[in-house]
Amino acid sequence: MVDPLILGAVGAGLAVGIAGLGSGIGAGITGASGAGVVAEDPNKFGTAIVFQALPQTQGLYGFLVAILILFVFKTVSPWAMFAAGLAAGLAGLSAIGQGIAASAGLGAVAEDNSIFGKAMVFSVLPETQAIYGLLIAILLLVGVFKGNAGAETVAALGAGFAVGFAGLSGIGQGITAAGAIGATARDPDAMGKGLVLAVMPETFAIFGLLIAILIMLMIK
């Protein structure tokens, strides 16, 4: 039997490490755009900070899950802790897509302040994948798996993989959202169609979320 502390430590590391990787890249993409914007107009510094903060939330979710794992490792299934870290960490890579969208949003706002609200709407879309990962991680950590140890292991890993890998769709969603921001900046009436296109990639994240929940209900 694997020591629970080992799997808990690995799960915590995956949560904060992978999610932090995504947030670091996403924030870097937006920050690079922000540096150019501030060079042109120093008064846009506050706006640049707001947009750069958006892809950092995934890292915070990963940090939160890591802390939770370290607090509950004595009472939760060891593989559930590992899977929770996997779910939060992989889904946190959606920050890369959010950084791409936020970078485009910042560039659009630099040209026209009136588009700020619309740019924010598109920029936050890729974060939902990370929220799905956070949700499944919390459900795993509250002890939904009781009973057969072998079934617990397989189910926990299945749920973590489902929502985690499906959460990578946030990268594609961010790319689409960035294009939609550009289209909306040119033609405000294009926002509705742009939103439809931007939410399409999220369908697969929802599939992953649903399968993860069904797996947990099946084993429970």
UniProtKB/Swiss-Prot annotation:
CDD domains: ATP-synt_Vo_Ao_c_NTPK_rpt1 (cd18179), ATP-synt_Vo_Ao_c_NTPK_rpt2 (cd18180). GO terms for cellular component: membrane; plasma membrane; proton-transporting V-type ATPase, V0 domain. Optimum pH is 6.0 for ATP hydrolysis. GO terms for molecular function: ATP binding; hydrolase activity; lipid binding; proton-transporting ATPase activity, rotational mechanism. Keywords: ATP-binding, Cell membrane, Hydrogen ion transport, Hydrolase, Ion transport, Lipid-binding, Membrane, Nucleotide-binding, Transmembrane, Transmembrane helix, Transport. The chain crosses the membrane at residues 5-25, 63-83, 90-110, 125-145, 155-175, 195-215. Optimum temperature is 80 degrees Celsius. Component of the A-type ATP synthase that produces ATP from ADP in the presence of a proton gradient across the membrane. The A-type ATPase is composed of subunits A(3), B(3), C, D, E(1 or 2), F, H(2), I and K(x). Subunit K dimerizes and may form higher oligomers. Belongs to the V-ATPase proteolipid subunit family. This is A-type ATP synthase subunit K.
